[in-house]
Design a protein with these regions (language model features):
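Short, conserved, surface-exposed binding loops centered on an aromatic residue
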Residues: 31-32, 41-43, 79-81
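Non-catalytic C-terminal interaction segments of nucleic acid-processing enzymes
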Residues: 23-24, 28, 34, 45, ...
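Acidic-basic catalytic patches of nuclease active cores, encompassing PD-(D/E)XK
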Residues: 1-34
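Short beta-strand or tight-loop elements
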Residues: 36-38
Length: 151
């Protein structure tokens, strides 16, 4: 199980590095420790960011919303409250990168409770809440990861 999460975290960060090398959004990116709720911190000029990364096997036009787990949303917002790092939720899709600055949402996220099959825990998992972010609140870059794909 730990290997599954380790591999995903490494691939998430690799995607972020490659995307940033092409788009130059950040001056620096620093990974957070393993199993932290936040994947990385980043800087651009005088701005600092807390970054959560997610990879989704879907095209950008499949849904009008993208979900975030409630604990990740709350952790990013607490990070902003206590450190001033702007909360970014970065989603790598099949054909695009969708970036939400959670401080700049124009519409309140909807909440849902749902059951999912967890690949990491290999069982049906009950989640208390997920927030659904309106894709219109995001900045979207057309981009495709060139070097590797998730399995």
């Amino acid at each position: 199980m730990k290997e599954y999460f380790d591999m995903n975290e490494k691939q998430d960060l690799q995607q972020l590095y490659e995307f940033n090398a092409e788009k130059h959004l950040f001056d620096s990116i620093t990974p957070c420790k393993y199993s932290a709720q936040i994947d990385a911190t980043a800087k651009h000029k005088d701005r600092q960011f807390a970054v959560e990364i997610k990879h989704r096997l879907m095209p950008k036009d499949k849904y009008k919303t993208i979900m975030i787990e409630d604990y990740k949303y709350l952790e990013l917002m607490l990070e902003y409250q206590f450190t001033g790092r702007e909360p970014l939720y970065i989603n790598f899709l099949n054909d695009a990168v969708v970036i939400f600055n959670l401080n700049k949402l124009k519409s309140k996220p909807k909440q849902k409770v749902l059951d999912i099959q967890s690949n990491g825990y290999d069982k049906l998992q009950k989640l208390e809440r997920r927030y659904y972010l309106d894709i219109n609140d995001a900045v979207i870059y057309d981009w495709k990861w060139k070097t590797q794909q998730y399995s």
